[in-house]
């Protein structure tokens, strides 16, 4: 149970409300155009976590009335065949968005695969063109997890402008784009990574701490200042069956002002942000007569 003084950032409740809005919008669009947004999902191999995430995305599509096309490929698929499939999706007028579930097998060049996706269908927001637009504050598809984090903070009226933000993790998927969104919102941002000597130096002075590296209990209560906003993006499956984040929740919630739970925090916001991007892609394509 959360401490009485801390506010839980309930990503599940917010995502549920956004899904209701998306479902309503899609119903109106379908009635007017006789078309529905369609998300293409490519899954390579049988990684259990990837299968779980893909199934969650498909179920979310079903809840809002969005079509999907799932391609499950053998782990030994060649880059050429994978690129050919992406090319087909790029030119298919019935496909609104294309998503390649990561991680990919080692023999596949992930960078090349992501660059092969049409930027106008890159609903994951990983294409270099969309990342470049993010950096220059131009309209683009935002990576789903950072987008979800920002929406969650906005919903709870958490001020970012002028605040000190510490981001733990510098991945291309979360840390880097999230740091840019925070910077664009007027924050002073510090990004910590594997070579950072003393993470506490940054977290103890931060108004907002975001962490997503996959290490249970990495962030302790002693590493935070009282009243800090703590956004836990980590997902860790423990041997006892529990799912936890990167934050020592039971102790951190005693000093934090706001904190996301795991699960039902950032995770649901990631998925609903992906759906939002897919709807945006669909609407843009319809305006262009695609």
Swiss-Prot record:
Its EC number is 1.5.1.5, 3.5.4.9. This is Bifunctional protein FolD. Signal peptide: none annotated. GO terms for molecular function: methenyltetrahydrofolate cyclohydrolase activity; methylenetetrahydrofolate dehydrogenase (NADP+) activity. Catalyzes the oxidation of 5,10-methylenetetrahydrofolate to 5,10-methenyltetrahydrofolate and then the hydrolysis of 5,10-methenyltetrahydrofolate to 10-formyltetrahydrofolate. GO terms for biological process: L-histidine biosynthetic process; methionine biosynthetic process; purine nucleotide biosynthetic process; tetrahydrofolate interconversion. Pathway: One-carbon metabolism; tetrahydrofolate interconversion. It catalyses: (6R)-5,10-methylene-5,6,7,8-tetrahydrofolate + NADP(+) = (6R)-5,10-methenyltetrahydrofolate + NADPH; (6R)-5,10-methenyltetrahydrofolate + H2O = (6R)-10-formyltetrahydrofolate + H(+). Pfam families: THF_DHG_CYH, THF_DHG_CYH_C. Homodimer. Belongs to the tetrahydrofolate dehydrogenase/cyclohydrolase family. The keyword Amino-acid biosynthesis applies. GO terms for cellular component: cytosol. The keyword Oxidoreductase applies. Keywords: Amino-acid biosynthesis, Histidine biosynthesis, Hydrolase, Methionine biosynthesis, Multifunctional enzyme, NADP, One-carbon metabolism, Oxidoreductase, Purine biosynthesis. NADP(+) binds at residues 169-171, 194, 235.
